[in-house]
Every structure is written in C-alpha cells, then in structure tokens.
C-alpha cells in the first residue's frame, strides 16, 4: 500500500507513494477488469464511490475489497453523488466505519447533474466539518486559485482542481489557473476530472502537478487495460520532464550546432 520514501515520492498525509497516478474504480465492466486496469496503471491509491461500490455494505454481493485489498492499496472513499455538505459528511463517516477507522477521504460536493461542477460553498462547509472531525481530506474543487488556497488553509491534505468537467475528456482548459494554484500551494495538487488521453496527463505533470486522478479516461477507453498502461507512462514522462526543466519558448530559431570551427 505504501513504500519506503523514494527520492521523488508523492507524499499525502505523511505517507509516501511511488505512483503519481490515482485511479477510480467505477465504470469498468466487472471487478476483474477493475483489477487488471489498476495493476496496469501501477496505481497505489484508488478511489471508491461509497454510494455506488460495495466495500462491505452488502455482505451478500461481490466486494471491491476482494480484488483491491486494503493491504495492497490505499483506498480513497469519495463522496461522489453528494450535493450537500451534510450528505458528504454523512457519507465520509459511513466510509470510516466500513474501513475500520480509515480517515483519508476524497471530498466532492456537486452543484448540479449537468456540469458536475463542485458547489464551492458546500465544499468549504463540508471540508471544515471533516477536518474538525479528524478526517484527512483530499478535496475536489474548481480551478479557482483563491478557493484552492482557502481549502489548503482549512487543513485539506491535498487539493484536487478539475482540468475540465468530470468525464468530458476535454483535457486541461485553463493551465494558467492551474499554474497559479501549483505555485502557491504547500500541499499536493492533483488534477481531478477532465483528462481524456495520455497527452493530457503528461501536460498536467509538466505543469508541476503532483499527480493526476482519473477514471473515465481509462474505464471508457476501447481497451481500458492498454489505456491504463499508457497513462502510467505519460505520468512518469511528464514528471521527469518537469524535473528536468523544459527549454524556454523563443520566437526565433536557435542553432543546435556550435558555430566555432565552421569551414569557410
């Protein structure tokens, strides 16, 4: 589930992770495909929609824990489908009970069914309650830099701005807002929602995001297992490119070969 601290670890709530790709568990055709895609992604943190996925609520139905055991993965229960702070807090408390006191949670409070944009007022309210209740909150939010900082100040352990609407596959729509969030953050910034393909994930990492969470981009692909593998490589490549430092953009050419010793 967690590993000894490598030189470039993703650190969330004091735990070190080698993988910067977080994956969802919804929309797959069955639990076996969920397992195979998660393995291909090399994900260590997997999100679980408590309202939609069985992790023990129904002892007579197949459980996600059968294929993604907590001993191997960090399960990140989320509040998908919640539209009020009260509902989100109630869902988090249920998850903590089902997972034997597990405090790490992903908070999302939606504004409407059409856009699935976060309701920022309800999100702030829920975040304050959950942090006060001892939860380690990773929070889905808009790409508003002021709001992102406010959620960090409340005590959220990671801030997760959207790249585009959930499930849209549009990719990053406002990289300048993301850069502003990243540059001012003291907690991990993880892009959540809107990624469509590997290049989207790579761009997020090149900008300096600490990780990317995705579900539809993998589960909705023609070959989810292959896409999971592609996303893993994109995350790794984007992170390495960020650490390496890209060359500056210039208007005019710059010769790659030296002029010293040119004949003539």
Curated annotation (Swiss-Prot):
The active site is at 106 (schiff-base intermediate with dxp). One of its GO terms (cellular component) is cytoplasm. Its EC number is 2.8.1.10. It comes from the Bacteria. It is found in: Cytoplasm. It catalyses: [ThiS sulfur-carrier protein]-C-terminal-Gly-aminoethanethioate + 2-iminoacetate + 1-deoxy-D-xylulose 5-phosphate = [ThiS sulfur-carrier protein]-C-terminal Gly-Gly + 2-[(2R,5Z)-2-carboxy-4-methylthiazol-5(2H)-ylidene]ethyl phosphate + 2 H2O + H(+). Keywords: Cytoplasm, Schiff base, Thiamine biosynthesis, Transferase. Pathway: Cofactor biosynthesis; thiamine diphosphate biosynthesis. One of its GO terms (biological process) is thiamine diphosphate biosynthetic process. It is an enzyme of class 2 (transferase). 1-deoxy-D-xylulose 5-phosphate binds at residues 167, 193-194, 215-216. Disulfide bonds: none annotated. Its main location: cytoplasm. The keyword Cytoplasm applies. SUPFAM superfamilies: ThiG-like. GO terms for molecular function: thiazole synthase activity. Catalyzes the rearrangement of 1-deoxy-D-xylulose 5-phosphate (DXP) to produce the thiazole phosphate moiety of thiamine. Sulfur is provided by the thiocarboxylate moiety of the carrier protein ThiS. In vitro, sulfur can be provided by H(2)S. HAMAP family: ThiG. Belongs to the ThiG family. Homotetramer. Forms heterodimers with either ThiH or ThiS. This is Thiazole synthase. It comes from Xanthomonas axonopodis pv. citri (strain 306).
């Amino acid at each position: 589930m967690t590993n000894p601290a490598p030189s470039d670890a993703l650190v969330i709530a004091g735990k070190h992770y080698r993988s910067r790709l977080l994956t969802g568990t919804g929309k797959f055709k069955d639990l076996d495909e969920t397992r195979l895609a998660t393995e291909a992604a090399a994900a260590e943190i997997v999100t679980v929609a408590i309202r939609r996925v069985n992790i023990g609520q129904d002892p007579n139905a197949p459980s996600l824990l059968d294929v993604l055991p907590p001993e191997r993965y960090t399960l990140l229960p989320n509040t998908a489908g919640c539209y009020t702070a009260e509902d989100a807090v109630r869902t988090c408390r249920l998850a903590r009970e089902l997972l034997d006191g597990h405090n790490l949670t992903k908070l999302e409070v939606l504004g409407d069914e059409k856009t699935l944009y976060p309701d920022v007022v309800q999100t702030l309210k829920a975040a304050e309650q959950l942090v006060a209740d001892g939860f380690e909150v990773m929070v889905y939010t808009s790409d508003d830099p002021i709001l992102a900082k406010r959620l960090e100040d409340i005590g959220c352990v990671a801030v997760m701005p959207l790249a585009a609407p959930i499930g849209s596959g549009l990719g990053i729509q406002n990289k300048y807002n993301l850069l502003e969030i990243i540059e001012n953050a003291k907690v991990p910034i993880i892009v959540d929602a809107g990624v469509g393909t590997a290049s989207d994930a790579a761009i997020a990492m090149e900008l300096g995001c600490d990780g990317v969470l995705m579900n539809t981009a993998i589960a909705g692909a023609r070959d989810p297992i292959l896409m999971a593998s592609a996303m893993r490589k994109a995350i790794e490549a984007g992170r390495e490119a960020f650490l390496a430092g890209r060359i500056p953009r210039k208007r005019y050419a710059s010769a790659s070969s030296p002029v010293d010793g040119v004949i003539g």
